[in-house]
Amino acid sequence: MNLSIQDELQLFSEELYHHLTPSLLDKLAKELGFVKRKRKFSGNELATICIWVSQRTASNSLVRLCSQLHAATGTLMSPEGLNKRFDGKAVEFLKYIFSVLWKSKLCETSAISSATFMYFQRIRILDATIFQVPKHLAHAYPGSGGCAQTAGIKIQLEYDLHSGQFLNFQVGPGKNNDKTFGTECLVTLRPGDLCIRDLGYFSLEDLDQMDQRGVYYISRLKLNHTVYMKNPSPKYFRNGTVKKQPQYTQVDLEYLMNTLKPGQTYEIKEAYIGKDQKLFSRVVIYRLTEKQLQERRTKQSYTESKKGITYSKKSKRLTGINIYVTNTPWGIVPMEQIHDFYSLRWQIEIIFKTWKSLFQIHQWQNIKQERLECHVYGRLIAIFLCSSTMFKMRQLLLHKRKRELSEYKAIGMIQDHLFLLFQAIQKNIQAITKIFIRLFTLLKKNGRKSHRYEKKTVFDIMGVIYEYSGFKKQQKVA
């Protein structure tokens, strides 16, 4: 059924309203023990201050927070009284709301149509972001060590690039291991998924599990793993019989790197990775351009000086190449497209960038643990609301107007309308729908993605058909 824009936004509004009505929040606060008797500061007031009206719950003064609460709801609180309300039950309340939201059906109708969707039901992007917290919280949130931080929070996120649906999520200490979380995510895999993983999540065991479950993967290869290829030139005795020798030989990656030109791609056919545990896979090598090489060297120097991490001599020698392993069929993703497909992973970096630059999730004063956690989960709820709205608008603009939405621009514009959305939720579904229609009109006018330097966008790589503006309107097919 081809619904109108208003009809689709009304269905989206109904799902949102179902989770965030004032009466539901107050009822939930009683069920979770945040409120034990009738009080002026209940679940809706806590949600108001942490989600809707203050994005600096951890850094603004308590006096300022009381002022913002009074301006939004008319509730009068003392700074001491408000600080007491930031307790363990408040954290549990906000954490529960966030958990229900990201597991909800908000993004079920936000998937876009693309050429890749014919082969990959979901494109799963997994990564983590980390930020420092007050040192006195090191017992609860130990950092990653080294000279980088003594206390920190790491947030792990895996989401579907087609729909924006959050698939796996974790808030934990900065020292948490990425690879362990990556393994835990395997239980949510479905046949036909495509997992794109970076080096922090690399595991031969996990990749083998994906292959056995009918799941595709594209991953960077850690350089401490050896690549073997089928012996291309067996040696013979004079009588023509083959000399006894290994069927596979070790690949000299440094030699291979030096034979490639910048920007060139090469595939090692009939290869496997690992000495003890063998993973038979396509191995694709991409030689970085000079610009990419300089960026990598700059990043390595920063990492060594700021985070206390030392790269091995082998890693430094092989800085000029990316080595990818994948089980995607060559006919669907040829070697020339592997690097582009892997670059889809960088979309999650844009999402994490908004968390800090727009939502200030990493900003705090020297405060107690419960208030910091209320800030984090309040920001995560606001982030999810803006993110899910953005993905819905992206789907509508593509389906109805054949346009590509800029994720970063859109999330900023949606955030600007959060307080209007808060006011609408206090009323009814129709009021929420009106705000979303206003947002759609704004994003249609000002939210188009810029096409700079002829770089491929997400839609280009995924094979989405859409219109873009040059000197004249054209239809772009990746």
UniProtKB/Swiss-Prot annotation:
MF GO annotations: DNA binding; transposase activity
GO biological process terms held by the UniProt record: DNA transposition
Origin: domain of life: Bacteria
Function: Involved in the transposition of the insertion sequence.
Transmembrane segments: none
Keyword Ion transport: no
Name by which UniProt lists this protein: Transposase for insertion sequence element IS231D
Family the entry assigns: Belongs to the transposase 11 family.
Keyword vocabulary terms for this entry: DNA recombination, DNA-binding, Transposable element, Transposition
